[in-house]
């Protein structure tokens, strides 16, 4: 059963542009550091803080 309401207009859906052809800047490819490398860097800066982080995250 198709309902047609004269007060409701039908929107025409245009084909979405290809994501590769967007006019804006592209998102940089940035990989997040793993938890192990994060802990190593934290130990270099502040050993006590890295221990607290280990306890909070359960590592």
Curated annotation (Swiss-Prot):
Pfam families named in the record: UBact
Cross-link (Isoglutamyl lysine isopeptide (Gln-Lys) (interchain with K-? in acceptor proteins)): 59
InterPro entries for the chain: UBact
Family listed: Belongs to the ubiquitin-like protein UBact family.
Domain of life per record: Bacteria
Post-translational modification: May be modified by deamidation of its C-terminal glutamine to glutamate by the adjacently encoded deamidase. This could be a prerequisite to the subsequent conjugation, as shown in the other prokaryotic ubiquitin-like protein Pup.
Entry-annotated residues carrying Deamidated glutamine: 59
Keywords: Isopeptide bond, Ubl conjugation pathway
Record's protein name: Prokaryotic ubiquitin-like protein UBact
Gene behind this protein: ubact
Region Disordered, residue ranges: 1-59
Role, per record: May function as a protein modifier covalently attached to lysine residues of substrate proteins. This may serve to target the modified proteins for degradation by proteasomes.
Keyword Hydrolase carried by entry: no
Keyword Transmembrane helix: no
Record GO terms (molecular function): protein tag activity
């Amino acid at each position: 059963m198709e309902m047609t309401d004269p007060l409701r207009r039908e929107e025409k859906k245009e084909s979405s542009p290809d994501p590769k052809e967007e006019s804006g800047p592209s998102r940089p490819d940035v990989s997040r550091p793993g938890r192990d490398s994060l802990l190593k860097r934290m130990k270099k800066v502040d050993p006590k803080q890295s221990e607290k982080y280990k306890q909070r995250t359960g590592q």
